[in-house]
Structures are given as C-alpha cells and as structure tokens.
Amino acid sequence: MWRIWRCRLSFLFVTGCLLGALTAGLGSQMSDSVGRNVQAPAGVADASQEAGDVVEERTERTEEQVFAPGPPRRHSSESLFPRNPSVTARRRRNRRITLIATAVGVAVILAALYVLRRRRAQPPQEPEPPTRLRTPRPRAPSGQQQPSESEPPAGVPMKPGSLTLPFTCLGDTKVTFFGPSGRQHGFTPLYDPSPSKRVATVDAGANALFIGGGGLNGQFAKTLLEEAEKNGIRLTSVALSEHSQRIQQSLLRRAVKSPGKLVELDTGVASPVFARSFGFVPVVPGLMWKESKVGANVGVTFIHILKPEVTPYGNLNNNVMMYTVAPCGAPPDTTYSLAYKTTIAGVIRAAAAYNDTPAGQQYPVQGLRLPLLRGGIFRRNRSLESIGRANAEGTSLAITQYGPNFELQYMYDPSNAALHGLQEAESTYLASMLD
C-alpha cells in the first residue's frame, strides 16, 4: 500500500513541476507574441511607401515643434506607432494567466510535499483483512505433496534448538526458549509434526479480531488454509478472515457480560474451522484504560478447538489454538504496563479455566507456545526490555494466583527479551526471599 501511495505522490510532484514550467513558458511566449503585434501594427508592412511619406511629414512637424515657442512636448512610442488598447488588455490578461498558472503549479508541488511528509510521519496501522481471493495452488500428485514456503520439507528437522529453565518465581514452572530454526528468519514453527503433548500456540491477533493479514496472524491463516486444501475443504483467505471475525466478535459480546469467566460457543455445525470456541476477558475492554491509547479489544483471549480437517499435520495434539490482543506501544508507561500485564495474565488464566471444562478434560492444554506479544513494529519506540519485564510480571502474577499445570514455550526472539525479563524477575524474587 505504501508503494502505491509513493508512486501516486511522485506522479503528483512531477506533474506539478511540469505544470509550473509549461505555464511559465506559455506566458513568456504569449508576451513575445503581443510584443511583436505592438511593433508591427496592421497596415505598416502593406503600405511601405505611405509609411515613408508619413515619416517625412512627422519629421517636418517635429522640427516645427522644436523651434516653435511654448513648453516642450513629451515624446513617446505612440508618436510613430499608436498603442492599441486591445493589445494592452491582452498583454495584461496574459500576464494574469501566467501568474495564476504558476501559482497553481507551486501549490500542487507544496501539497505533494506536505502529503508525502505526513505519510512518512504516519505511524504503522493495523493490517486490514485480505480482500482478494487467492488463486488455488496446483496440487501435487497423490503421495507427493510439495512442501509450502511456510513449512520446510519433511526431511528438515522442525524443532529448533531450545533452552529449558525452571523458575522459582513461577512456582518451578518449566519455561522453554526456542533458538533460531531452519526456517526463514529463524521463526519457530506454530506446531510440531509429532508433538508429545498438546501445546496450544497463541496467535498475536489484530484489534479487529480476524485471522489473517501479516505477521504471526498471517502465518496462522496460511497454516489453516493449507491444511484445508490438503483435505479438500474449499476455504479462501477472505472467507477465513470474515468467519473468524464474526465468531470472535460474537464471543466478545458474550464475554463482556461476564468478565473474568470463560464463555463457550458451540461452533461445530456452522464453522468450517472451529469445532468449539471459548472467550475470556479479564476486565471489560476500555474500563481500566482508554482504547484510543492502547487499541481496541485489548486483553481479550479466545480459545478454539480446531476441526480435524484444519488441524496442523492432522495430529490431535495440535488441535487447540489461542488468540489474544495485546496493547500497542504508544500509551504512557503506566497504562501500557497495566494493559500488557492484564493481557498476558488473561491468556494464562483463560487456558487454566479451559482445562476445567468438559472440552478441556477431553483435550487438555499441557503447554502454551507464545510469541513476544507486540514485539514488532507496533511497539513503536518502546524498548524490548520493557516489554520483557511486563511479560514476566504478568506471567508471574497469573501463575501465582491460578497455578496452572502446564509449561510455557517462548518462540524464537533475537532480542531474548522474554528470557531476560524472566531472569530479572527471578533475581528479584530470590532476593526478596533472602530478606
């Protein structure tokens, strides 16, 4: 989108420059034309002999005037060629046209520069849901399904190197920090091909509550669409975006009526993706902070049990996904810290509440795989260290209060902000125990 705007602004700028140059040249050309008309009035070129006689007569008259008594008379260009009033009016009109056209060209240039400056200063916006239908990819012959760009070939190890540490401040909960994988940019895969336990991966969702767009949210959409295609389910990115948005907005309306409680929605019949869905809000969105500062629907968490047709790798241990909305990095520190800690605590609290439901008893969550929420472009000028600290404080608060019995897995982050934040929280906790 920014490339399109940049092309439009460049075209507008060049057009303004050409307009200013052309109008200035046009005005100069018209002035020269008028000058030529003044220097050669009608009748002079066609009657050269008569002009000579007129000159002689005027010469004699001039001599008489010079030697005649009385005040001297002023000489002007009208003595030989009388000024034509219509020519003078045209000259003035052409000058006005030149000035106006030049002013318009300058105004266009200044407007283009102003819009370009405002566009560059504009903060990054939340990605919009996809609006174009994707052309279905040709399927490989049966038994020879080709690997997609989002998943490496079957022979490439999926699980990246990791570091697992117990944290006393988290009740000795084991936390795994993934290193870079063999995928593009070292990204951690959303799910493993053969997991030993059920791990629910948390999607860093959009404020508009749809699945799709860019970043991790787009990777979730791509994974679900590829699984649907493998199983012959006709599902487009637009349909997935609209359907997920409709389901999650419905869950949100139910959840805000019962803050702090997990609400349930049976989506099995009407949904091509979700067998069952849950919604949770720790507090009513916008009650403890201004949504104009942190963003809409911050703190909400959704849990979806995926249908077998869209479950990654067809493994039942991959059939649970979570979706949450974290704050952007623009608000003041106090507001941001409160919203972020509430969000991450809500994710852990919702997963613990889900395990107490009948569906959770059937498909219990034994681990959470999380990204560093809002650690990308939407953090604005906020440091990754401050996000890591807020994440650690919210996680410690939730585990201390609700004591969930599952491990935490953090996806690869080059800054290691989540690791450093938890290490700092651990040091603070151990120091307080010694006191």
UniProtKB/Swiss-Prot annotation:
Keywords: Membrane, Signal, Tachyzoite, Transmembrane, Transmembrane helix
Claim: Transmembrane helix is one of the keywords in the record: yes
Keyword Membrane: yes
Vacuolar side: 28-96
Membrane topology: Single-pass type I membrane protein
Location (main, coarse): membrane
Disulfide bonds: none
Gene Ontology cellular-component terms listed: membrane; symbiont-containing vacuole membrane
Subcellular location as annotated: Parasitophorous vacuole membrane
Signal sequence range: 1-27
Biased composition (Basic and acidic residues): 55-64
Residue intervals annotated with topology Cytoplasmic: 118-435
Residue stretches spanning the membrane: 97-117
Region Disordered, annotated ranges: 43-89, 120-162
Summary of the function given for this chain in its UniProt record: During host cell infection by tachyzoites, does not play a role in tethering the parasitophorous vacuole to the host mitochondria.
Descriptive protein name: Mitochondrial association factor 1 form b0
Species annotation: Toxoplasma gondii
